[in-house]
Amino acid sequence: MFVDQVKIYVKGGDGGNGMVAYRREKYVPKGGPAGGDGGKGADVVFVVEEGLRTLMDFRYQRHFKADRGQHGMSKGQHGRKSEDLIVKVPPGTIVKDEKTGQILADLVTHEQTAVIARGGRGGRGNSRFATATNPAPEIAENGEPGQERDVILELKVLADVGLVGFPSVGKSTLLSVVSSARPKIAEYHFTTIVPNLGVVETGDNRSFVMADLPGLIEGAHAGVGLGHQFLRHIERTRVIVHVIDMSGLEGREPYEDYVTINNELKEYNMRLTERPQVVVANKMDMPDAEENLQAFKEKVGDEVKIFPISAVTKQGVRDLLFEVANLLETTPEFPMYDVVEESEASVMYKFDAESLKFEITRESDGTFVISGYDIEKTFKMTDFSRDESIRRFARQMRGMGIDEALRARGAKDGDIVKILEYEFEFID
């Protein structure tokens, strides 16, 4: 089964917790703090495996959660960093953030890697918080939460040449004649429902990969007839071979087919029209084909070069392959996406720097709800089992301006303040 789009969940490993510990050694009075830092959580890393051809495996496993870092230990020992979680994907995979639509990675070459969900850093042990005024702190941080997100994986086949056209114009037959590929061929529409790839050798030591793409219909750019699923596979091709049925047996007019398919390519993605297109008049072995070809030439004009062929008898196929090979030698690749490098601040929330700190809303029962990347991260990294850590968290909230903001919103003594799923009492 060919699967070319899936949605999965990925989560980087949480950082290990820092430790509160003290040096206890004979003849060393007042040894001081000796709690180690936690280890970094593992990243979720996508790696291209050239042997894969489909996203089928992701139908059965949709959640990928990396291991957390090891906790800090006594005697100043830091926790171990966890090994990254490796997820193998086929070449041609594009990774998008499901929430924002941002392109995270375009993976095309063997063993190419991309970090899709970063692991959190380890929490600091109490030895990190020692000062002249507080030489034996009872403070340690929890590990930073790992990044988590839903992502969309899209597979766009890696081919140099794409065969496009209406259903039943002979694309699959042409591919089977010029390569060792054996696509399904039958006398009904949409026999081809998944892309078929074949390696074409021209006989003069040149070769290229050709893709037989499922037939298009009018409205494909808007998703009609699974158009989006089919058209995405054209995006990576460098040369488009437009196959047109000249027999007239399907009751369609060749010029109308030509215009309709080109409009679909243009409407789907403007850059598809930048690629060189080879127009192929197929089924020239049929009775009315020559007459239909002459009428077609009159309508398209002399500027369009047409290759009359018969995929069944192989008439004209050799000249077609040489033309395609010549075009490939002079046509560069067309990058479809600019992958944006993420900064840590933009990993999960796409706001400006100020809005990342916190936001205060009020529920119908009067509870104040505080949310935002910075405050939630600070909250998760606080060890609330220790009084000194709680006091530090209160100072951090004041430093962010949360106390003042709550007063400005009308908060009074005894009001309930909520962060994530935890509730606190506001004391002025």
UniProtKB/Swiss-Prot annotation:
One of its GO terms (cellular component) is cytoplasm. One of its GO terms (biological process) is ribosome biogenesis. It is an enzyme of class 3 (hydrolase). Residues 350-428 form the OCT domain. Residues 159-329 form the OBG-type G domain. GTP binds at residues 165-172, 190-194, 212-215, 282-285, 310-312. Its cofactor is Mg(2+). Its EC number is 3.6.5.-. Mg(2+) binds at residues 172, 192. It comes from the Bacteria. One of its GO terms (molecular function) is GTPase activity. Keywords: Cytoplasm, GTP-binding, Hydrolase, Magnesium, Metal-binding, Nucleotide-binding. Disulfide bonds: none annotated. Signal peptide: none annotated. Residues 1-158 form the Obg domain. HAMAP family: GTPase_Obg (MF_01454). Monomer. An essential GTPase which binds GTP, GDP and possibly (p)ppGpp with moderate affinity, with high nucleotide exchange rates and a fairly low GTP hydrolysis rate. Plays a role in control of the cell cycle, stress response, ribosome biogenesis and in those bacteria that undergo differentiation, in morphogenesis control. This is GTPase Obg. The gene is obg.
